[in-house]
Design a protein with these regions (language model features):
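A general secondary-structure boundary signal
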Residues: 4-5, 32, 62, 140
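Short, well-ordered coil/turn elements that cap or connect secondary structure elements
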Residues: 9-11, 30, 58, 139
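A short His-aromatic
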Residues: 40-44
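S-adenosyl-L-methionine-dependent methyltransferase catalytic module, highlighting the catalytic core
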Residues: 46-58, 63-184, 188
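Local beta-strand N-terminus motif with an aromatic residue
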Residues: 14, 32-34, 60
Length: 189
């Protein structure tokens, strides 16, 4: 919100809502917002397609999405070493989704749909490939453009370049986009 105020955007022209996103979007009227932002949320949803449907219903014009992809499963969490030997570019180009366990208690919030395993509270993250995301967009009748981060990308890389703690520490913030670990879209409703 500070950014919007700093940029002198009229407070009556935006609204930030902090609550369960699914419950909120299910009860609002269709086409309630010109633009719906979805940054860092989609992968925490047990059913990401359901959230996409709700956002498409709520938006008049545009949905902006920034999310992790299936490649993220190869670099994040203690199970990552089990995943990355099996993740090839051929697999990551298929329309599929990988679900991985993650701690349900985060720094500032708790994830929904928690379950206990060996005394730890866990949730799942849902990590679709780009192909899966675009299949969903098409099924919802949306047109899209992938946002271009190339002007910020310092080097070509893949998730293989971001496996170790040392690689992550020395990486540039845009490496997650260059590697396909993260992707951004502008969806037209």
């Amino acid at each position: 919100m500070e950014l919007f105020l700093k940029e002198k955007i009229n407070p009556s022209s935006f609204r930030f809502q902090a609550e369960n996103i699914t419950n909120f979007l299910e009860r609002i009227d269709e086409k309630s917002f010109n633009t719906v932002f979805c940054f860092g949320v989609l992968y925490y949803m047990p059913e990401p397609l359901h959230l996409l449907k709700l956002m498409a219903r709520a938006a008049k014009e545009t949905i902006l999405i920034d999310t992790f992809t299936a490649s993220y499963s190869a670099v994040q969490g203690k199970d990552a070493p089990k995943y990355y030997p099996h993740l090839t570019s051929q697999i990551l180009n298929l329309p599929l989704m990988i679900s991985c366990p993650t701690q349900s208690k985060k720094k500032d919030y708790n994830l929904p749909e928690a379950f206990n395993r060996k005394g730890r509270s866990l949730s799942l993250i849902s990590l679709p490939t780009k192909a899966m995301l675009e299949l969903w967009f098409e099924s919802l009748g949306l047109t899209w453009e992938q946002l271009d981060w190339s002007s910020h990308i310092a080097r070509d890389c893949s998730f293989h370049d971001l496996l170790t703690p040392e690689q992550k520490i020395t990486s540039h913030w845009a490496d997650v986009y260059a590697s396909g670990i993260r992707v951004s879209y502008k969806l037209h409703v």
